[in-house]
Amino acid sequence: MVVRIDGKIAAISTDYAALAAISARLAQQKSPAYRKVTAETVGFDDVWDIRNKAGWNDMILFGTEFQKKVWRRLFDLTHEEDGSPKAPRLISYSDFADLCQNKAGVRAVAHAIGLNPAAVVIPCHLVIPKESIDYIKGVQEKAQSTIFKGDDISMEKLLQEKGIDFGEYALGRRLKRALIQKELSQ
């Protein structure tokens, strides 16, 4: 479901919870600042299309300044400054906290990631546990060694490995794995 306020993306979720939360927030405002709130049920391909076309200014997000800063950094993982798509990459929570200039606040950054209202468009699924990053790098390094040269150890095949923990995701672990696979196979 895509929730929009005056045409701008406010949330993406699998149920009406995001719409209810936004409606409650808007109801608390003294004077209505927005004219139109809509919610549309869409399929995964539609959400992916929105993700590829949306720029940062196409969203209206409710959260603290810190949360918005974290969400912007997440958005920048898959988008250039001008909003055009760029090659995505997996990143650990600690490295992402450092990217947010908050190395000591990994938990605060992780919490803000978990509150991301526009999952998929703001790619919180690309942030995974450091142990998983280290494992993937280790396998890739082995693939470059003479012993494993010629073996089929592609990223696509590696991401299907059930032993890799990609971490929690508001929309479920299975969807997080599927999103990472789709993101990195493009």
Please give the residue ranges for each predicted region.
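Basic nucleic-acid-binding alpha-helical/helix-turn surface characteristic of O6-alkylguanine DNA
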Residues: 1-103, 145, 149-163, 174-186
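Short glycine/serine-rich loop segments
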Residues: 103-177
